[in-house]
């Protein structure tokens, strides 16, 4: 299944706020109206919607998300928590959380078009897994810096998660440590996502 490129507002109206996909938010009460029209949801539907929420927020294909679930299942610790950490430490998401891109699709464009360096080297793979002490910077070109500055200008600094440090005037971000679960930027029940995939096998 390919990455979603359709109407974004339609998705947030059904699934709730997806800040990685779009800065728009559903109108107050719209999710309650949708629930009343749809009636009581089945457990399968609830798990499916949590999975879709995760997929659309991080901009993943079905195959990519399944791959992350399998990696998380083999790691030590809670599968759901490890899954969220893996997704949060992707380069495209780190750029978004730093405020260097307004959405994850925008961050992916910056990476694909070679505007971003990690530890002084250009990285053009959005799924690159960032590590503690990684230094993320904009390429030293006017075009790269203008694109990032536009995002930084509208980014509320108080929303910067604790595992990251931003130096806006240097167009530089630092990864201090692996993200703590309370700083995940999405309202999600990750256990339902794990359950969804465990029931598919």
Swiss-Prot record:
One of the primary rRNA binding proteins, it binds directly to 16S rRNA where it nucleates assembly of the body of the 30S subunit. With S5 and S12 plays an important role in translational accuracy. GO terms for biological process: ribosomal small subunit biogenesis; translation. Part of the 30S ribosomal subunit. Contacts protein S5. The interaction surface between S4 and S5 is involved in control of translational fidelity. Residues 20-43 are annotated as: Disordered. HAMAP family: Ribosomal_uS4_B. It comes from Populus trichocarpa (Western balsam poplar). Pfam families: Ribosomal_S4 (PF00163), S4 (PF01479). One of its GO terms (cellular component) is small ribosomal subunit. Signal peptide: none annotated. Residues 89-150 form the S4 RNA-binding domain. It is found in: Plastid, Chloroplast. Keywords: Chloroplast, Plastid, Ribonucleoprotein, Ribosomal protein, RNA-binding, rRNA-binding. This is Small ribosomal subunit protein uS4c. Belongs to the universal ribosomal protein uS4 family. Transmembrane segments: none annotated. GO terms for molecular function: rRNA binding; structural constituent of ribosome.
